[in-house]
C-alpha cells in the first residue's frame, strides 16, 4: 500500500474577535469586527496550510500570511481596511516558502496548489509560491473575489498565475473537484463563509467495509477531512456555531452540518479545522 502523508504547517497566527470564528445569537451586530468590544474578546488562533504527499506528488492547500506582515506598517499597507479586524503574527521561519524550504521543497517543486478560498489569511502567501506550476481556486470563489473588494484583497495575488477549476465530480450529494481523477484528493464545495469555499478530503488506500454511503458517498477509502473555515474549532462542531463572517448564513449551517456528518463517518480518521488551536503542526500518515 502507498503511504499518504499530510503535513500541517502553522504559518503564524491571526488575532481576531472571538465572534469571528464562533457566531452566537447573543452577539451584538458586527461583533466580529471587534468594534466597541473589550480586549478580553480577542483570541489568537493559528493560520494553517497543508502539504499532501501521495502518488501524484506534492499538493499544497492554502498559503498563509505574507512576510510583509512582519512590520506594523507593512501589515497595515498589506491588509488595508481589513487590518483592524485581522491582525497577523508571522514569526521568522514560519512563512510558507520558509517552511517548504525546511522540507527541501522549492515552490516550483510543488505539483499543485489548491486554494480553499481567497480570504486574506489563506491567500496572502500566494506571491511567495508563485513559481508553482499550477495554482487553482474554485470558479465561484474567484468570481466573488473579483467583485467584492471588502472581503477580498486582490493585491495578494497580483502577479500570480491564479487559475480556476470547475466542479467535475461529487462527494455524496455535494459538488466537488477531483484534480487527479482518482478521488485521492477532493475539493468539496462547502459555501457560506465565502461563496466558493471548499473543504478537502485526503484519501488513503485502506478501506472500511460495510459502511453506508452517508454524506461522503460510496467510496470506502479512509480519509482525513480538512474543513478549512467551514468550522474554526471544537465549538463549531460541538455547539453548531457558524463563523461570524458569512456571505450566506443558511449555506454556512448546511456546510457545517455536512462537515459534522463527514467527521463522524467511520471512514474519517481525523478532521482538522484550519484555525483550531487544539491542532498541532506536524505530519500525519494514512495508508
What is each of the regions a protein language model found here?
Residues 1-105, 109-121, 128, 134-189, 209-211, 222-229, ...:
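Metallo-beta-lactamase
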Residues 5-8, 42, 49-53, 59, ...:
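Core dinuclear metal-dependent hydrolase active-site scaffold
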Residues 124-131, 282-286:
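Metal-dependent catalytic neighborhoods of phosphoester/phosphodiester hydrolases
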